[in-house]
Amino acid sequence: MKTEIINRFISYAQVDTQSDENSETCPSTPGQLVLAQMLVGELKAIGMQEVTMDSNGYVMATLPSNTDKEIPTIGFLAHMDTATDFTGADVKPQVIENYNGQDIVLNEALNIVLSPQEFPELAGYKGHTIITTDGTTLLGADDKAGIAEIMTAMDYLIRHPELKHGKVRVAFTPDEEIGRGPDKFDVSAFDAVYAYTMDGGPLGGIEYESFHAASATITCKGTNVHPGSAKGKMVNAAKIAMELHGKLPANETTEETEGYEGFYHLSSIQGDVEQTQLRYLIRDHDRNRFQERKSELARIVEELQKTYGEKRIELEIKDEYFNMREKIEPVMEVVDIATQALENLGIVPNIQPIRGGTDGSQLSYMGLPTPNIFTGGENYHGRFEYVSVDNMMHAVNTIIEIVKLYEQRA
């Protein structure tokens, strides 16, 4: 099974599926359709039933029940796209057997080294088989590790009919990294009572709390005049943008917060004297504090509009997703079973809030409670991304154990 999961993961990682937030299609990039078609073929080859891919690239399949018991249908999901933060083209995964705990030279020519001195958690993987990048791309363990784990678990269950289980649905979705994963997901067609995204990080992670999330775009408009005769005439849009940013709490940024602490994240700033645009991510686990953050940003904009004129500054805020805890707590069985599965396997559950979101954040509000489970990856979205194959195997066993527990509890 170890060789199978390595081969699966590498074959997926080599397909460029980076999503594109500027695209209006679904999926946002053609590479995701290439991977989707691969997955359809593989699902059919291992014996899954009702394998479908719709016009938007959503892949679904069924593992039929093999018992007469009435068992709730559960689902497992992973996303096909990779992050926009770093290139996902021409990924060259490197497999390191029995990692020795020392520096890993990812790329000798470019002097790119993955070091436990810079990433202390790496030392904890001594003795593991790990997969890294070659230092020039991201790896795509987020979330192709999840795809490989779901596929391997389904393959195992099909090969072992003596393991009794209810109906299991799987889905592979596009465009999670740009926040559109569930936009065209057909919850009624998926037809599961509960689901799990395999989209987490290190071993043991179970997550059922996400941020409340919004994005803000602020456009500052100036008047450009020759610097030599600008007095009393020039209005510098870039300077307005700097003033605006300076009014936000300096200790409430991504670099200064952790755990349940929310933040304002200036994700991009572009412009000049004539026009400058700021883009922010607004995040908080608490709904009231989330609303306060949006209101505070609006208040700052209004304050500056009084100084520079209402037409000089425009603010657009869009809600993206909400904390799935509000939808999962009423049905905590879905979390309890995942926790029990880990304990049965001798894995210590690590239940933490997600400082981000998953497809499950939105799916939970669409009527499908969907907590998140670890995949074994680290350092997502960059050249130092890696995944432990040993912990990928633990994730496979976790899926199998969850399926078994639903049958046993029926």
From Swiss-Prot:
Co-factor binding details: Binds 2 Zn(2+) ions per subunit.
InterPro entries linked: ArgE/DapE_CS, Bact_exopeptidase_dim_dom, Peptidase_M20, Peptidase_M20_dimer, Peptidase_M20B
Its cellular-component GO annotations read: cytosol
Keywords (alphabetical) are: Aminopeptidase, Cytoplasm, Hydrolase, Metal-binding, Metalloprotease, Protease, Zinc
CDD domains in the record: M20_peptT
Q: What catalytic activity is recorded?
A: Release of the N-terminal residue from a tripeptide
Q: Does the keyword Cytoplasm apply?
A: yes
Q: Which cofactor does it need?
A: Zn(2+)
Q: Which Pfam families match?
A: M20_dimer, Peptidase_M20
Residues binding Zn(2+) 1, per UniProt: 79, 142, 199
Record's keyword annotation contains Acyltransferase: no
Q: Which residues bind Zn(2+) 2?
A: 142, 177, 381
Any single GO molecular-function term of the entry would be: metallopeptidase activity
Q: Where in the cell is it found?
A: Cytoplasm
Q: What is its EC number?
A: 3.4.11.4
NCBIfam families, A to Z: peptidase-T (TIGR01882), PRK05469.1 (NF003976), PRK13381.1 (NF009920)
Q: What does this protein do?
A: Cleaves the N-terminal amino acid of tripeptides.
Protein name stated in the entry: Peptidase T
Per the record, the gene is pepT
